[in-house]
Amino acid sequence: MWIKKRWRCWNVNVRVSLISQYNYVLEISYDGSQYNGSQYQPNKRTVESDLKKHLIYFFKDIENLIFAGRTDAGVHAVGQYVNFTSTYKLDTNLVRLHINKHSKYIKIIEFFIDKKEFHARKSAIKREYIYLFSTEQLPVYLSNYISYMDSPVDKVVIQECLNMVIGKHDFLVFQKTGSNVLTTIREIYHAKIDEFQYKVLTDSNKSIMLNKITIQGNAFLYRMVRNIIGAIYMIASSNNKLSPNDFKKLLLQKKRIFNFKPAPSSGLYLNKIWY
């Protein structure tokens, strides 16, 4: 049985099934500096609350949005995936255009209906995060999007430590304290640091050196990437006496043998997800 509706604002025919549910999938990007993380929190602005506000205008029966990965306050996404179910069947391209027009900090890249079994988090087989930082003074317009590190670092040491996380390990020491997961074992497929020059937009004669850390894995614990990079920064910093061997001990002993802080959220991006 079907019910037909016509929406005046878009002149879109909407078919509402009283039996079937459609599994909608979105690929989105967002500016994390505007949000208190991706996951819904009462009385706080989050990616989930903002996105749901736009979607519910069209899909009146939305209950839950399922995100492929959870991001902290200030963390950005280039290719985050979200799915939800609804009995409403709409033209996803028109909905995408409408939301992109009215949403400043969240943009929909792709929007489509997939098979019912698809689950944004559980169906993912690989994820990629990138982390951008510089030890040079940044233009103010980049301060929310690239992390500033106040001490020079040895990039050879950074890569040596990154090589240690490749493979299957227990990353217990790098998860946020108090996290509740079935297992803290994760597999990292790729971890690398690169550097490149960025031409300052407001001064054509000036450029700054940026560093990009890329990490790919099957899944990540909450705050795992920021903690790994924070610990490596402590070791690679020019004013520290720690060595890559200390990072190895940290990983193997699964306890904090030295204090470190998570790297600032501003430089972290959920970049890609594979299914």
Task: Label every PLM stretch briefly.
Residues 2-8, 12-275:
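Structured-RNA-binding interfaces characteristic of tRNA pseudouridine synthases
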